[in-house]
Regions:
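Glycine-rich ThDP/TPP pyrophosphate-binding loop and its adjacent helix/strand module
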Residues: 1-118
């Protein structure tokens, strides 16, 4: 956290904030203060974006490049397993190995998502 003190404006960190951990919802396990306020208190430029949105992430990195005198942290508010009917928002995927049937469904979900973007 000393990067803010030293004004390391060539440093960019990214926090994957999916609100899940191996044992469940992070808020159920331990109350989380505002990530944004915490980083800002240490002198960081804070950008909070929808982390599953590539355009938003690219834009955040562009903004970070132009921030002078402070390091930047991007809080990427993500959905774990986004786009997969099998995995989305399920904490057990921190450690679970998919079955062949689950892999098939995951690939189908991703193919459908890819087609929708075309």
């Amino acid at each position: 956290m000393s990067a803010g003190n030293y004004k390391l404006d060539n440093l960019c960190a990214i926090v994957d904030r999916n609100r899940l951990q191996i044992s469940g919802n992070t808020e159920d396990v331990m109350k989380q203060d505002s990530q944004e306020e915490r980083w800002a208190a240490f002198g960081w430029n804070v950008l909070s974006v929808p982390g599953n949105d590539m355009d938003a992430l690219v834009h955040a990195f562009e903004l970070a490049k132009h921030c002078k005198g402070k390091p930047t942290v991007i809080i990427a508010n993500t959905t774990k397993g986004c786009g997969s009917s099998v995995m989305e928002n399920k904490a057990e995927w921190h450690h679970k190995v998919p079955t062949p049937e689950e892999v098939e469904q995951i690939m189908k979900d991703l193919d459908e998502r890819k087609e929708a973007l075309s």
